């Protein structure tokens, strides 16, 4: 294979999956085939999309009801020659799913890149091992928390929040994705002030915390804004990838003057991936493509919290982020939304140690504040790695958290 193989879930009311697959393969490449003169067929053969696989799925009444017609469901695989497109994500996505995305009854499940094609993508600059080296934390999941309620607040408020989270043992604190450039907490000032706080905490408590700052602005200003952030001392860049595009992420990741990890936020991605019938699958969008384009971290809804993905989907995202690939470093999985300490055993059981446990309200909502919330999570992580049930741990911060949010994982064993 020298090009790319696209896997689709299709719904066909003509009940002829093979014909539908061939129509897609031709429609996204040379347009027609059977009526072409033999000589022209020979000339265009190397550009033709090829149907590799057609598999009929069981009938699904809910799908028929939603579409208001009876359809035949199937999985098809089509190979697109590398000759047809330039080796960049805009060209790849337009080739494999451009006008087809308007069908409304086709979902792009996966893209399998040839080795030749993979060479054109950077992958994570740091990856899991690089991030762990920055923090000197190698034996446990990382803990991340989020600034909350920063809109309309000043630098003093940010510094207080940051200090409390760092003292609580949080490894990474990230901006809220809706915190943009503003007069009260401008980008450079956030970074400089934040670094002062984190250095003070490190000198006092010996705990290192990294700050992920939200890089925003117009598309053609992003590189300059990212470089300003780096010059000010940014540890990590948070980036709302899907508000801009995967190719923009790649351009940031490939820039040698932006030598810091990039954290990809899933904001807007639901517009592409939420439907089970059409769009782009979450594992492909939030897993494989983010990793290839250069994300060191990928945030996505966990199977447990307030904005939940199905467990199978969440684990598939993580698989794409962390599976062995000689071309790319591994990216950190960051299952998010509604996470509290009682979920820690689930997260470690399902995602392993190479995961970032990300909490907002589960840290800030603790009775002892963000310090208590962070300590509760760290205690839960340590107990889980020792295979000790959380309810048996004698720790006031963890006990308080379990009283508030519950302990759904009390029977979980690693």
UniProtKB/Swiss-Prot annotation:
Disulfide partners: none
Keyword Metal-binding annotated: yes
Keywords: Amino-acid biosynthesis, Isomerase, Magnesium, Metal-binding, Methionine biosynthesis
Modification sites for N6-carboxylysine: 174
GO molecular function: 2,3-diketo-5-methylthiopentyl-1-phosphate enolase activity; magnesium ion binding; ribulose-bisphosphate carboxylase activity
Binding-site residues, Mg(2+): 174, 176-177
Catalyzed reactions: 5-methylsulfanyl-2,3-dioxopentyl phosphate = 2-hydroxy-5-methylsulfanyl-3-oxopent-1-enyl phosphate
GO biological process: carbon fixation; L-methionine salvage from methylthioadenosine
EC identifiers of the protein: 5.3.2.5
Cofactor note: Binds 1 Mg(2+) ion per subunit.
Pathway: Amino-acid biosynthesis; L-methionine biosynthesis via salvage pathway; L-methionine from S-methyl-5-thio-alpha-D-ribose 1-phosphate: step 3/6
First-tier enzyme category under EC: isomerase
Domain of life: Bacteria
Residue ranges that the Swiss-Prot or TrEMBL entry lists as coiled coil: none
SUPFAM superfamilies from the UniProt entry: RuBisCo, C-terminal domain, RuBisCO, large subunit, small (N-terminal) domain
InterPro entries: Diketo-Methiopentyl-P_enolase, RuBisCO, RuBisCO_lsu_C, RuBisCO_lsu_C_sf, RuBisCO_lsu_fd_N, RuBisCO_lsu_N_sf
Keyword Isomerase: yes
Swiss-Prot/TrEMBL cofactor(s): Mg(2+)
Complexes and interactors: Homodimer.
Function: Catalyzes the enolization of 2,3-diketo-5-methylthiopentyl-1-phosphate (DK-MTP-1-P) into 2-hydroxy-3-keto-5-methylthiopentenyl-1-phosphate (HK-MTPenyl-1-P).
Record-stated family: Belongs to the RuBisCO large chain family. Type IV subfamily.
Remaining remarks: Has no RuBP-carboxylation activity.
Protein name, entry field: 2,3-diketo-5-methylthiopentyl-1-phosphate enolase
Source organism of the structure: Bacillus cereus (strain AH820)
């Amino acid at each position: 294979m020298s090009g790319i193989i696209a896997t689709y879930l299709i719904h066909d009311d003509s009940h002829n999956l093979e014909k539908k697959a061939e129509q897609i393969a031709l429609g996204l490449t040379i347009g027609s085939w059977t009526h072409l003169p033999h000589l022209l067929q020979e000339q265009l053969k190397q550009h033709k999309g090829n149907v590799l696989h057609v598999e009929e799925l069981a009938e699904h009444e809910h799908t028929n009801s939603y579409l208001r017609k009876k359809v035949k469901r199937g999985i098809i695989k089509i190979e697109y020659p590398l000759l047809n497109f330039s080796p960049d994500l805009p060209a790849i996505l337009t080739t494999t799913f451009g006008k087809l995305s308007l069908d409304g009854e086709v979902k792009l499940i996966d893209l399998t890149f040839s080795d030749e094609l993979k060479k054109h993508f950077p992958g994570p600059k740091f990856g899991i091992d690089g991030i762990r080296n920055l923090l000197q934390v190698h034996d446990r999941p990382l803990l991340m928390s989020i600034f909350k309620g920063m809109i309309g607040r000043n630098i003093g408020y940010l510094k207080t929040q940051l200090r409390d989270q760092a003292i609580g043992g949080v490894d990474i604190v990230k901006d809220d994705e809706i915190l943009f450039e503003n007069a009260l907490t401008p980008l450079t000032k956030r970074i400089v002030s934040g670094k002062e706080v984190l250095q003070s905490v490190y000198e006092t408590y010996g705990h290192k915390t990294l700050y992920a700052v939200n890089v925003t602005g117009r598309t053609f200003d992003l590189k300059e804004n990212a470089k300003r952030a780096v010059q000010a001392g940014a540890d990590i860049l948070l980036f709302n990838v899907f508000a801009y595009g995967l190719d923009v992420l790649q351009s940031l990741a490939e820039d040698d003057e932006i030598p810091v990890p990039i954290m990809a936020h899933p904001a807007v991605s639901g517009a592409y991936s939420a439907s089970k019938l059409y769009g782009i699958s979450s594992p492909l969008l939030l897993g494989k493509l983010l990793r290839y384009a250069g994300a060191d971290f990928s945030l996505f809804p966990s199977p447990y919290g307030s904005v939940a993905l199905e467990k199978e989907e969440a684990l598939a995202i993580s698989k794409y982020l962390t599976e062995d690939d000689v071309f790319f470093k591994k990216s950190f999985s960051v299952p998010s939304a509604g996470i509290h300490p009682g979920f820690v055993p689930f997260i470690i059981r399902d995602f392993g140690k190479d995961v970032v446990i990300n909490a907002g309200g589960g840290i800030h909502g603790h009775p002892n504040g963000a310090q208590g919330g962070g300590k509760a999570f760290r205690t839960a992580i340590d107990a889980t790695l020792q295979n000790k049930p959380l309810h048996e741990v004698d720790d006031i911060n963890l006990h308080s958290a379990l009283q508030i949010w519950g302990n759904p994982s009390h029977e979980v064993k690693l």
